[in-house]
Regions:
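Domain-scale detector for complete catalytic domains at protein termini or as standalone homologs
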Residues: 1-89, 93-243
């Protein structure tokens, strides 16, 4: 069922609507993050691309909603908002979400994206080591994410912020922990993947495993930086989307 306009709007943060842009880019964040992870992308994209960061339940404008990720509902929202050719970029957990959304849209026979862009994301048939963070202490969870570069070390001095962030982190890592890949045909959407050369959570070789999950072509670029290379490589990624 397609969401109505009011419920559809809550799914997206669109700082610069571009209804005349010939293409849309839906952006899915990593665990614990929200649409704010893609701050500045809309301005950098230029007039030819409308950037739509996704707002997942339990955070940002949906703070009062229960945590939880439902692929069917996410696919409903993307399908309803995609009113022209579009692509999906997913980083880390967001890449797995994007892949499952495409599989759901395929099952429904709905229009598929032109391309799936993935950053720092383990293939769906691989065990995700970070999923174990759903079961560790708060201190270990925050410490591991600081080590990866996903959180600033200064956050530890802000207990109120930690209190707000921890439930989001735990909900997302629980989704990753409970995720079970269901074997199926490769998607009929090209995959363009980006790997951080110094990523401590996933190797470049592991990311090559995405090649077997598409029948429409696969490319992999190795970017300077760690797991969150997209912060410095945003413009390069957008160049690839617009190419």
């Amino acid at each position: 069922m397609r969401p109505d306009t009011s419920s559809l709007d809550r799914w997206f943060s669109v700082p610069q609507p571009r209804p005349a842009a010939p293409m849309q880019l839906f952006c899915l964040p990593w665990a614990g993050a929200g649409a704010g992870a893609f701050q500045g992308w809309a301005a950098a994209a230029g007039p030819g691309l409308e950037v739509l960061p996704v707002v997942l339940p339990g955070r940002e404008g949906r703070f009062s909603e229960p945590f939880g990720i439902d692929i069917g509902e996410l696919a409903d929202a993307v399908s309803a908002r995609a009113d022209r050719p579009y692509a999906i970029y997913g980083h880390s957990m967001g890449g797995r979400l994007g892949f499952e959304v495409i599989r759901e849209l395929t099952r429904r026979g709905e229009p598929l994206p032109l391309r799936l862009y993935l950053g720092g994301c383990r293939p769906p048939d691989h065990v995700e080591p970070l999923a174990e963070l759903s079961e560790v202490s708060d201190e270990e969870l925050l410490g591991r994410l600081i080590e990866l570069g996903g959180l600033p070390e200064e956050l530890l001095a802000e207990p109120e912020l930690c209190e707000l962030l921890l439930p989001v982190l735990r909900a997302d890592f629980t989704w990753l922990h409970e995720y079970v890949y269901q074997p199926g045909p490769p998607i009929e959407v090209p995959i363009e993947a980006f790997a951080g050369a110094d990523d401590k959570s996933i190797s470049v070789e592991a990311m090559r495993g995405w090649a077997r999950h598409t029948s429409a072509g696969f490319t992999l670029s190795v970017e300077p930086g760690g797991h969150f290379f997209l912060r410095e490589r945003r413009d390069h990624i957008l160049d690839r989307v617009r190419a």
